[in-house]
Amino acid sequence: MLRYSRVLLFLIIAALSSCNQYNRILEDVYDNDQAAREWTKWMSSLSADEIVEYSTEMERVDSLNQATVFGILDKEGWPSHLSDKANRAIWIVIDHSDLAYRSKYLYLVKEKAEEGVLDKTDYAILNDRVRMEEGKPQIYGTQIKMAATIVDDDIAMQLCLWPVENPAALDSLRSTVGLSPIEEYLKTSSESIGQEIVWDKEKTVADFD
């Protein structure tokens, strides 16, 4: 019995050591991701050359972060017992990757949202974004995009809610993932960016081409 207890203790210590190692690695990933995006806060004051320089560096950091995070996910799956910051790092790296990777790891984000490791809104946003980039209607109404709209008999580009698969059930679906009613969301988002966001229920995906 003592032998088995020692084996169990060894396994627990090894697991904790592995968890701590992942936390250190992933928390560094999070910090690097955020640092690489600091420049976007003052982007309006930068020259074109400076924007190119910062963008290139951000892409380099993203590439390194993706190699780290996706290497862990592909080899070990999503590690358990991570810190909130480490879990957030995985989500951010997936979110900042291209469509192929977002689609690949979407099921993991859904699993972790259902487990409470991530917010359900994280899954809703990623799911809608993937569907939009695949040319499909979104589910939760989190994505907006520019589209040609008739304004005062003229055609103008307008920020619009990307088409929704089931408009009648939208608010109900949003509530299941902790999102506010769509009209409230559109109002606050419009005020935040200083530009009206329109939901034209007649628009289809084809209208955004």
Over which residues does each language-model region extend?
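Immediate post-signal-peptide N-terminus of mature secreted/exported proteins
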Residues: 19-60, 67-70, 205-206
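Second-shell loop/turn segments in exported
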Residues: 51-59, 91-97, 156-160
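C-terminal partner/receptor-binding element of secreted or periplasmic proteins
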Residues: 173-209
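Short, 15-30-residue, compositionally biased linear elements
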Residues: 153-168
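Mature extracellular/secreted ectodomains of secretory-pathway proteins
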Residues: 70-145
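Anionic, Ser/Thr-rich low-complexity intrinsically disordered regions
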Residues: 133, 138, 159, 202-204, ...
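Bacterial Sec-dependent N-terminal signal peptides
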Residues: 1-25
